[in-house]
Amino acid sequence: MAAAGLALLCRRVSSALKSSRSLITPQVPACTGFFLSLLPKSTPNVTSFHQYRLLHTTLSRKGLEEFFDDPKNWGQEKVKSGAAWTCQQLRNKSNEDLHKLWYVLLKERNMLLTLEQEAKRQRLPMPSPERLDKVVDSMDALDKVVQEREDALRLLQTGQERARPGAWRRDIFGRIIWHKFKQWVIPWHLNKRYNRKRFFALPYVDHFLRLEREKRARIKARKENLERKKAKILLKKFPHLAEAQKSSLV
């Protein structure tokens, strides 16, 4: 009885394997039991399993396309762009928004610099070069707003105007400089390196300081005279603008 039961079980297993082989195409290798264990029990379309690719052949750009302009703008002479961000607009935003906006502007700047370099290489005019100036102005305004917030927070917490404490001192050439304080391991009266610094000027330096002040005054006066001459030339060249300016003042 045991032998008959074992033979009946073997026949059922062999019939089940034959029926499973009939469902799979001839491309399946001999070890069909391994593949059948990976598939779900209810697989109406088993032939689609062999259509999958084991190797992914798409291009791995890794974000390099962000260094190039939108393909829609390729070949165009002018590209529309908005105005630059102002400090007043950026002051109304949170720190998180400013952080995100900084990286957006940085990516845009890298893209425009790549476009500018490629235009130089091909000896072609860059489409809408004012976009780069707007991005640079926006980044400068954002940096200024962040610096204002850091200064305000530091004044509130420590009362210091500068990030690193210091004092106005005079060097050996008589110039007034901002000396930044630094932490030392040993006291100042035992520190030879600190004692070599001279925060005073000898009397013979006063003559050269006077010459330097005279030089700065001459440069300033020369610049003002040049601006006045340019203004007179423009008034003679465009008299209607002078009349319009006088009427607006009245």
Swiss-Prot record:
Keywords: Acetylation, Mitochondrion, Ribonucleoprotein, Ribosomal protein, Transit peptide
UniProt xrefs under InterPro entries: MRP-L47_sf, Ribosomal_uL29_mit
Record-level GO BP terms: mitochondrial translation
Database matches in Pfam families: MRP-L47
Gene3D superfamilies named among the record's database cross-references: 6.10.330.20
Location relative to the cell: Mitochondrion
Molecular function GO terms recorded: structural constituent of ribosome
Record bears the keyword Ribosomal protein: yes
GO terms for cellular component: mitochondrial inner membrane; mitochondrial large ribosomal subunit; mitochondrion
Domain of life: Eukaryota
Main location: mitochondrion
Family, per entry: Belongs to the universal ribosomal protein uL29 family.
Quaternary structure (record): Component of the mitochondrial large ribosomal subunit (mt-LSU). Mature mammalian 55S mitochondrial ribosomes consist of a small (28S) and a large (39S) subunit. The 28S small subunit contains a 12S ribosomal RNA (12S mt-rRNA) and 30 different proteins. The 39S large subunit contains a 16S rRNA (16S mt-rRNA), a copy of mitochondrial valine transfer RNA (mt-tRNA(Val)), which plays an integral structural role, and 52 different proteins.
Name the UniProt record assigns to this protein: Large ribosomal subunit protein uL29m
Gene name tied to this protein: MRPL47
